[in-house]
């Protein structure tokens, strides 16, 4: 489960950068 946190955080960060 802990290994998914960086993936989710990275995905959200990339989405915010696109905005």
From Swiss-Prot:
Principal subcellular localization: secreted
UniProt entry tagged with the keyword Cytoplasm: no
Expression by tissue: Expressed by the skin glands.
Modified residues (Leucine amide): 19
Organism: Phyllomedusa trinitatis (Trinidad leaf frog)
UniProt PTM comment: Phylloseptin-1.2TR is amidated, whereas Phylloseptin-1.3TR is the name given to the non-amidated form.
GO cellular component, one term: extracellular region
Location in the cell: Secreted
Family from the record: Belongs to the frog skin active peptide (FSAP) family. Phylloseptin subfamily.
The organism's taxonomic lineage, starting at the top: Eukaryota, Metazoa, Chordata, Craniata, Vertebrata
An individual GO BP term: innate immune response
Function: The amidated Phylloseptin-1.2TR has weak antimicrobial activity against Gram-negative bacterium E.coli ATCC 25922 (MIC=100 uM), Gram-positive bacterium S.epidermidis ATCC 12228 (MIC=100 uM) and against fungus C.albicans ATCC 24433 (MIC=100 uM). Has an anti-inflammatory effect, since it inhibits the production of the pro-inflammatory cytokines TNF-alpha and IL-1 beta, and induces the production of the anti-inflammatory cytokine IL-10. Has an activity of stimulation of insulin release, which may protect the species from being eaten by predators by causing fatal hypoglycemia.
Protein name listed in UniProt: Phylloseptin-1.2TR
Key words of the record: Amidation, Amphibian defense peptide, Antibiotic, Antimicrobial, Cytolysis, Fungicide, Hemolysis, Immunity, Innate immunity, Secreted
């Amino acid at each position: 489960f802990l290994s998914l946190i960086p993936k989710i955080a990275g995905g959200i960060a990339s989405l915010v950068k696109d905005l």
